[in-house]
Amino acid sequence: MNSRTLNGLPSGRFCRTSHVAFPRVDDRRVLNGIFWVLRSGAPWRDLPVYYGPRTTCYNRFVRWRQAGVWDRIMDALAAGHDAAVQMIDTSVVRVHQHGACIADNNHQDIGRSRGGLTSKIHAVVDNNGLPVHLALTPGEAHDNRLCSVLLSALLPQTMLLADRGYDANWIRELARQQGAWANIPPKRNRKDPICFSPYLYRARNLIERFFNKIKQCRRVATRYDKLAANYLAFVKLASIRIWLRANESTP
């Protein structure tokens, strides 16, 4: 052993050890692990070992989200939506205590409403109930807060379906300026008459069924994620699965 010392210790104590290079975990295994967490709602630490190390799955989920991978996939699929009819609505999700352990919940789209800590999913779907736009706000936010953003790309001749919570003159004007027609039931206190078709309005159940489908994924039905960006990424992953299943069934 070398007799030279460093701070009174033999220099041999500081020799570099050999590094073992582990093979990269296959992306398909990692993606299956991410979908397993999405469907089961389990913590990352409970991820089965055959999906790879849990830290690897979580890190790639976050890195792909930060790189915009989930957004690009969602946008590419939504580009083929049926623009004849679009429906907008929201759904409230309870926030688990594991997702509410940060100092400032307001910056993570967590609000306090009658049911406790909640977040609200805003969605726009097409004539087939397939998602087009998705967003997230605190649970106490009004349903029409994001209308100016979610409805900014309506095509001419599009029929917009929404419930009474969206009966506002500025929303109808927003649709009219884009050449679309807002078929929204009037509020009971509305004085000026409007054009509304109850028969066409019956198709609005498709967006309710969309929320039912994504909430079959337990990671969406209850928010366990502290970061709003991570939770919205899970919502988009559930929506991507709906799009893929719809495309598989199309001849």
PLM feature segments, named:
Residues 1-251:
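Short alpha-helical elements
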